[in-house]
Amino acid sequence: MHTTLKNIFSRAAQQPLNSRTPALSKRQRPLFAEQLEARRLLAADATVNLTGASQSLLGEDVNFVVTFDNTSTDPTDNIGYSPFVDIVMPLTGDAPPLPNNGISFPSGSTASYNGLNLSTTEVIFDANGEAIHPFAKDSAGQPVIVSGKPGDQLIVVELPFGSYGPTQPPIDIHFTGSISPDAQPNHAYDVTATGGYRYQVDAVGNPTDDNAAFGTTIVDPVQPQLFRLKKTSNTPEHETATGPNFQHSYTVSMAVAPGQTVYNLELTDTLPDEVQYISVVTISGNSSTTPIPQTSAPSTTSPGGTLSYAFDQVIGTGSDNDVQLVFDYYVAQQDANGQDVIPLGTGGTKTITNNSSATGLWTSSNPNFPTQQTVSSNASDPNSQYALTARTVALQKGFTNLTNPGSPKAGDEIRY
């Protein structure tokens, strides 16, 4: 159970998983332990999980999902009444000073469950970093004070259930966050979510007997990107046989944040020792001067090497085609060290991973960050890599619907 005694009557007393906890204010009074021990409380556990897109661009909207669940193992008093979720959006970001450059809950937007718009209340943290919860009460019947950063948003989402028990399945609540175009690339902006019950284990809602309950706060650190890479190949099912008879192509795509300009962009593809480079099919950059100079080229007779291009500038549209590099290759039978990629007579396999990266110069429109910055792609982004399996023999199986192509129905004739 994630809920603790101290966070039932004061949200300020609970600790997010990776945040510092502010001191209690005079209005945030924990209840004496003996009163809690006299009643069966905390049985209804409000557990949440928070996920969002990890590689979102400056100025983009991010789709978040909060998964709410009652994970109580108590066999009796385990029902929570009037469930809700508190979401804190880091609207201010790096401010003060202005402008705000974080992630906001867009004006006029709402949270939803299964396509149903939910009742959503927005409260702005005041100059003291306090927000009065719209309905949660403490043991004295007073509104719960939620602590946060002055100017950030508290978004309270009421779930469409009168009660919620541990036998009910987890539910997903969807909402959107808008990343400021003035945000700093690769800087973590924390979005948090906390589950709760307006009435702990009693539908009557007498505040002196049944005040609000809160679960553990979950943090999702969102790191906006100036640009993101996407690496693909036309190998069927991510596998190929070795040798020059089985040629394929890699495609390296880059999306640059809308309206942002990257200068002196260097795009690099590092070929593994098992991959033999053949030739470039196409190279392009939005608003780049052509021809785009090649700064490094792999050998066409020996596997491995580095393929690089230098773009004087790229103006972003947010499309994956802001930059595109396509080149042909095959998996050699022997690697750059003269060793068999797949030893003869073994009939084995080998996983081969190809990596791409990019570095460029960029100046923010945010007056608080006037200095030109060197920005690099996220090396841990799995989308900038492509893994394939080399085999001595690679087989694929497909089919064609001869009766209703594209609209399969029972009884159709299928050709494999």
What would you call each of these model-derived segments?
Residues M1-A44:
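Subset of Sec-pathway N-terminal targeting signals
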Residues A43-Y416:
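Exported/extracytosolic protein signature
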